[in-house]
């Protein structure tokens, strides 16, 4: 899980929840390097995060995921899957993850979704049975043709997929932020007034864009940020102040949420 926070003068604001956030492996390496050479950085680092603690915790997490999905026996082979993995900006992290997991006794491969095959025995990569897929794809529902083999393997329970479409829909679909910023919905969950206030203070107001409210959002567009409900990163996301009518006509057709604009914090370098 990853939480995208913008730090403001009034505290952090939750912009997105991600189920396939990257960077943990690389950040652990960076933190370890900094503690070795730069003592001044130590107070700024998260307590207890070092290679000695991070590595076994991560390996244990994969093992726990394996057993949480009712698998018997030992987890043996893990596939790290993404589109054209060697071309991804975070490919170095895939290599770091592979090395870490191999050191804990797992066989690990890095593959694209089109490299996978499905057989009665399970999901295969070059004839090797895959037990668990560490899913780095941004095709969250596995709807694209390239992802169909992985989708079928997941739906037929022939592989453990983490994260998977169910987990993304449950936690990371941006429409969930509409609920988390709705005081009536929060009250219906049985939260106290204090708990409700904490959440409302932390989550910028978010709403689904549809034809009924499109005109109002257009008139107030400078106060909002628009992004696909099932998108990722900055892809097809727009700051309202910079919207053109052509782009707005596409947003107004649906599939987008509007979030109260919260600028990211900046730092002088």
Regions found by a protein language model. Name each.
Residues 1-21:
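Conserved metal-phosphate-binding beta-hairpin within the catalytic cores
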Residues 6-8, 23-27, 34-269:
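Domain-scale recognition of functional cores that engage charged ligands
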